[in-house]
Amino acid sequence: MERKYVIGLDYGTLSGRAIIADCKDGTVLASAVKEYDHGVMSEYLPDGTELTGTGWALQNPKDYIDVLKYIIPEAVAQSGVSSKDIIGIGLDFTSCTMLPVDENNVPLCLLVKNVSRPHAWVKLWKHHGAQKLSLIHI
């Protein structure tokens, strides 16, 4: 019987990781890691918009795709297994990572009209930059 393998993906606070594991005994054959190009955005958005106040912990969803395009091929190459023998993928994100999307599942921050709007970007678990409500109108 041919051996089968799975890919494990972990998106952390500063980087993404992939492993290739043997389905039969869980042995990890290879792993790959790549840091996010934008890291955690706590002072500025990619377009230079300053994040005023404190508690910002934002990420760029493009980083998740860039990481994915690197770590999977790298881990598969290191493992020496054939991609046809990989039968599943498991995915994990850090705690409660919030990604606002539109009705077509496009991240709001990737729409031109929202690039300078901090609340359109991915919110990390440690984000505390919510705007305080000063007036309530009923």
Regions found by a protein language model. Give the residues of each.
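N-terminal glycine/serine-rich phosphate-binding loop of ATP-dependent small-molecule kinases
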Residues: 1-111, 136
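A mobile, often basic/glycine-rich helix-loop segment
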Residues: 109-123
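Glycine-rich phosphate-binding loop plus the immediately following alpha-helix
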Residues: 119-135
